């Protein structure tokens, strides 16, 4: 049984993504394009055909899916940005309150006279 397993195992062709599969990816990124040519761009975003009278073709499933993914991503970015802004404002308000409390403690009236000379009562 083990021999059969090794025969089947060695008979399987291994497919992998090598460096050659990503050839040109770095150049495309430097040019402001997608690393993968089918990632985004006119070939994936524009319709494949149009009507003879010039009307655009209805959007395909892939286009609708990509549009929905982009919308969800944009909504998530806006939500996280708003959360960051709210957190930053709360932190700044907290820092202002702490500074104000510290300033009040520094500017508080200091005891003078006999209370300074006499030792503090022990409890």
Curated annotation (Swiss-Prot):
Coiled coil feature spans: none
Complex and partners: Component of the mitochondrial large ribosomal subunit (mt-LSU). Mature mammalian 55S mitochondrial ribosomes consist of a small (28S) and a large (39S) subunit. The 28S small subunit contains a 12S ribosomal RNA (12S mt-rRNA) and 30 different proteins. The 39S large subunit contains a 16S rRNA (16S mt-rRNA), a copy of mitochondrial valine transfer RNA (mt-tRNA(Val)), which plays an integral structural role, and 52 different proteins. mL52 connects the central protuberance to the body of the ribosome.
Major place of residence: mitochondrion
Localization in the cell: Mitochondrion
Family: Belongs to the mitochondrion-specific ribosomal protein mL52 family.
Key words, A-Z: Mitochondrion, Ribonucleoprotein, Ribosomal protein, Transit peptide
Entry's Gene Ontology BP terms: mitochondrial translation; translation
InterPro entries cross-referenced by the UniProt entry: Ribosomal_mL52 (IPR034596)
GO cellular component: mitochondrial inner membrane; mitochondrial large ribosomal subunit; mitochondrion; nucleoplasm
Transit sequence range: 1-23
Species classification: Eukaryota, Metazoa, Chordata, Craniata, Vertebrata
UniProt-annotated stretches for the region Disordered: 99-123
Stretches with biased composition (Basic and acidic residues): 99-109
GO molecular function: structural constituent of ribosome
Name of the protein in question: Large ribosomal subunit protein mL52
């Amino acid at each position: 049984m083990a021999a059969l397993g090794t025969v089947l195992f060695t008979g399987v062709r291994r497919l992998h993504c090598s460096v050659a599969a990503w050839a040109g990816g770095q150049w495309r990124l430097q040019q402001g394009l997608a690393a993968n040519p089918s990632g985004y761009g006119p070939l994936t975003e524009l319709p494949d055909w149009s009507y003879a009278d010039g009307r655009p073709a209805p959007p395909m499933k892939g286009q609708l899916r990509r549009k929905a993914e982009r919308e969800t991503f944009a909504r998530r970015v806006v939500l996280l940005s708003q959360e960051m802004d709210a957190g930053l404002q709360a932190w700044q308000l907290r820092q202002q309150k702490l500074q104000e409390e510290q300033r009040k403690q520094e500017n508080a009236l200091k005891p003078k006279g006999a209370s300074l000379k006499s030792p503090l009562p022990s409890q």
